Swiss-Prot record:
This is Capsular polysaccharide phosphotransferase eps10H. The gene is eps10H. One of its GO terms (molecular function) is transferase activity, transferring phosphorus-containing groups. It comes from the Bacteria. Stealth proteins are part of a protein family that is conserved from bacteria to higher eukaryotes. Family members were first identified in microbes as proteins that help pathogens to elude the host innate immune system. Microbial stealth proteins are involved in the biosynthesis of exopolysaccharides. Stealth proteins are predicted to function as hexose-1-phosphoryltransferases. Keywords: Exopolysaccharide synthesis, Transferase. Its EC number is 2.7.-.-. It holds the Pfam family Stealth_CR1. Belongs to the stealth family. InterPro entries: Stealth, Stealth_CR1, Stealth_CR2, Stealth_CR3.
Amino acid sequence: MTKVIDFVVTWVDGNDEKWRLKKAKYDGSINTSKYSMNSEKAYREWGTFKYWFRGVEKFAPWVNKVYLVTDNQKPDWLNIDSDKLVLIDHKEIINNDFLPVFSANPIESNIHRIPGLSEHFVFFNDDMYLTAKVEPTDFFSEEGLPKYNTALSPIIPERYGTGNFQINDMEIVNSHFTRNEILKNGKFFDPKQGLKNVVKSLLYKNSKFICGFWESHLPYPLLKSTMELVWEKEKDILERTSASRFRNPSDTNVWLFKYWQIASGQYAIGNPKLGGLFTLDNAGPDFWSLLNSGKYQIMCINDGFNIQNEELVMNNFINALNSLLPEKSSFEL
């Protein structure tokens, strides 16, 4: 594959006093408690972001550009003169009438507006770490289609989870594609999806409606043209999400564009063993060993709601990352 591939990552420093004061002007009526949709946990900065960049440089040196999207912030250690780094402020991609925003949904729904972004790009959250070597073909096929591992799967509506967003995403997808079109295009029963996913799809294939897609919580290969197409067809809905200053149950999210690729059949099947989703809630010696084992090429490591000793876990997490990625990258001063 000879396509140019960029990476896009979003980041916020919730410890930044200037940013906190700006947020405080708007969040008076918002529930920001631990288990809420807009929990302060979502903005925590643990000092691990430099390891995200180290992973990119060590395990994906082929990447063209890395676009870091922030709210006029940057880590103190960041080398802004790095040849591959491009800093993007929210005002460059989001309508100024909607700013400031403190939710990932409007930000991620507008990443296709990044100036200079390539047609083929991979979107990362800042907790999605490269932990072993990856190739362009892990994300895109030789024909340039994004690679996903998926299945038919019901959406679980959790009070403070992403279920509301997924339901809204699927409502849009189901309004543009019939059930039969999705079943035909989705490649759900291909053995390359993995046995668990094929079995799951078989269980739900006779549902009256397409109930949802299984979400891997790994980086999202996307096509800029697909995001532009969905925006063209659903501008009003996506503008409402873009104007959503805090997470709102009526929002869509970035998975909409991935779901569109799946429903239209414009995707290739990815490796079901490429990576996994983990939480630090019960992290111990076995997990730190796993992080350094090379078993997974990508690990999404969520900080969780129920960490018992946050300071200890944070120190162990940083030590484990430093063991895997001890060398400073060109993205660092």
